[in-house]
Amino acid sequence: MPTVFPHDSVGLVTPQTAHFSEPLALACGRSLPAYDLIYETYGQLNAARSNAVLICHALSGHHHAAGFHSADDRKPGWWDSCIGPGKPIDTTKFFVVSLNNLGGCNGSTGPSSIDPDTGKPFGANFPVVTVEDWVNSQARLADLLGIDTWAAVIGGSLGGMQALQWTISYPNRVRHCLAIASAPKLSAQNIAFNEVARQAILTDPEFHGGSFQERGVIPKRGLMLARMVGHITYLSDDSMGEKFGRGLKSEKLNYDFHSVEFQVESYLRYQGEEFSGRFDANTYLLMTKALDYFDPAANFNDDLAKTFANATARFCVMSFTTDWRFSPARSRELVDALMAARKDVCYLEIDAPQGHDAFLIPIPRYLQAFGNYMNRISL
């Protein structure tokens, strides 16, 4: 429990809430008449307002990307290894904004928020949101903060998709786009994994059609299974083998179906239990659908190069060798399209055994490459 924070930490941070009363039209055809976005900032906005960086989170992420909320916090924000003084996203140089997206469950308006029309939680009645919807809401937050142009928009996984969408929806408001461990659209296999996770939630008897909050219950089993399936895809076979192998929890097998016998079983159950106690099931459904629906080239006759024709940003694309959820081949597909569109793009493939989750881990070569790129950004 840190009472004196590390020298490269942003230290104590306080979340802020932005309220928007102007309706937000959504891709699904519905609109949100009003909504809140919770966010944090790190560093100082310069006089020219030219040093702002937007952090876009992945499926289970949120606004708390760096620092601590109190001196008693056991863990810092989810990307603390990359944000802070002297880190790749250097807060002595950049003013960093990190938010929880619409539909989230960490303070921004989402399924667990109260629907003003009913006085009850939105639940399953919360509209389906897309990556494009998120970017539109983020643009309104930028307007509120007086930020006309982002020095960089950065994200990993689903966050990388948002960074890419920024260069399409608001091509003149982004100078650098960093898409890390991401893809221009999901593969059929990825959509299949998301569907298995959704079915685990939807078929949990405690889901109650999404109205579980009104009944004072949560679909714990469904959320647990969804997280277990998802977590397997975030790791690599090599990393799981190195960490767990075929290690047993006890000295012998029990020859039954209920005991936790292998160490990897124990790990997955722990991950599922922990996740089911902090995440909203309806939000999980929304996030996986946003992933599935992301396919910006569909609006350009499936021509990915044409998709980025109007982009003015410089691009940095990063992938990890053992990431099979968002493989290096998907990043190279994106890079090829950007080159065909004659965009300024660099590509980094990091040799790392940790799989998809490598983008969250302080791997020295990754941090060095990330920092080198950010150091090149002029303000």
From Swiss-Prot:
Activity control summary: Requires MetW for activity.
Main location: cytoplasm
EC number: 2.3.1.46
Gene Ontology cellular-component terms listed: cytoplasm
Location(s), subcellular: Cytoplasm
Domain AB hydrolase-1: 51-360
Enzyme class: transferase
Record site feature (Important for acyl-CoA specificity), residues: R325
UniProt-recorded Gene Ontology molecular function terms: homoserine O-acetyltransferase activity; homoserine O-succinyltransferase activity
Active-site residues, as the UniProt record annotates them: S157, D323, H356
Entry-linked InterPro entries: AB_hydrolase_1, AB_hydrolase_fold, HAT_MetX-like
Keywords: Acyltransferase, Amino-acid biosynthesis, Cytoplasm, Methionine biosynthesis, Transferase
PANTHER family: HOMOSERINE O-ACETYLTRANSFERASE (PTHR32268:SF11)
Family: Belongs to the AB hydrolase superfamily. MetX family.
Role played: Transfers a succinyl group from succinyl-CoA to L-homoserine, forming succinyl-L-homoserine.
Name of the featured protein: Homoserine O-succinyltransferase
